[in-house]
Regions:
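N-terminal low-complexity, intrinsically disordered segments
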Residues: 1-45
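Residues at beta-strand starts and edge strands
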Residues: 24, 49-51, 69
Length: 250
């Protein structure tokens, strides 16, 4: 329960290892200090059930000159068992604030500790050191995606595959509203879609999908949208888009 309002947050089993917010914040500060990071912002979701923080890593790269990508460390835990204590590297595209988990074929850039396991900050730090080593590989992938031009047919197929959208028929000549939104973001309505790195490229397709999830996908409120984009179905959809885009490189 919350100590300020005494509002119950959840009913958990006796195997559940409680991680107090103050302990997590101390760990966050210790971790960002050890890594030379800078804690930028923190907040809660779901009425205090989830606690999160973003730390700047200081890593930044540019794609085709003016498309800036920054690396952040996203730290989160829950008080109701719905989320493992998690530390994951996340990229932020400066022009639009789209977020994408820093992942490669060999690493997902995340460390997760179930609440049934004793929280060991040292173990998390060591694992994160391995995850952060994938930054260069991740940026190499992004640059390759920005150089991969796609045809209108490939773009159409990509969006349909990621959204599980059926092919157009006589009865369905436009596609779903979701398909139309993502397609319009790719075609020029998306933030930064006019940049040479994104216009008509596989990187542009990825950003159309991440912008849709982060800023346009239907949600009851911004709290729910952010929760989904970072930890739920939205995060899975963005990762699916990224993985699908990588197949265009071969």
């Amino acid at each position: 329960y919350r100590s300020d309002s005494l509002e119950p947050l959840s009913v958990v089993s006796n195997r559940y290892k409680v991680v107090q917010p103050k302990d997590v914040l101390h760990f966050y500060k210790d971790l960002v200090s050890a890594g030379g990071f800078e804690l930028e912002t923190a907040g809660v979701l779901k009425g205090g059930r989830k606690l999160w923080a973003l730390a700047k890593t200081g890593q930044e790269a540019r794609i085709k000159g003016n498309d800036r990508i920054k690396a952040y460390l996203l730290l989160a835990t829950s008080c109701d068992g719905t989320l493992c204590t998690t530390a994951q590297f996340t990229s932020v595209r400066v022009v639009c604030n789209n977020t994408l988990q820093l992942a490669t074929r060999d690493s997902n850039g995340a460390v997760k500790v179930p609440h049934s396991t004793q929280f060991d900050p040292r173990q998390v730090k060591e694992a994160l050191g391995i995850g952060f080593a994938s930054w260069e590989s991740f940026m190499t992938n992004l640059k390759q995606l920005s150089q991969r031009t796609v045809s209108p047919q490939e773009a159409d197929s990509f969006i349909r595959t990621v959204l599980n959208e059926p092919e157009l028929t006589e009865d369905n000549v436009q596609g779903s509203k979701m398909f139309q939104t993502v397609n319009s973001l790719y075609q020029g309505k998306g933030m930064g879609s006019e940049l040479s790195s994104a216009s008509g490229t596989a990187w542009g397709l990825v950003n159309a999908m991440t912008e849709y999830v982060d800023h346009h996908r239907r949600a009851r409120n911004q709290d729910n949208r952010l929760d989904s984009a970072w930890f739920g179905q939205g995060a899975l959809l963005k990762q699916k888009a990224f993985n699908q885009a990588l197949t265009l490189l071969h």
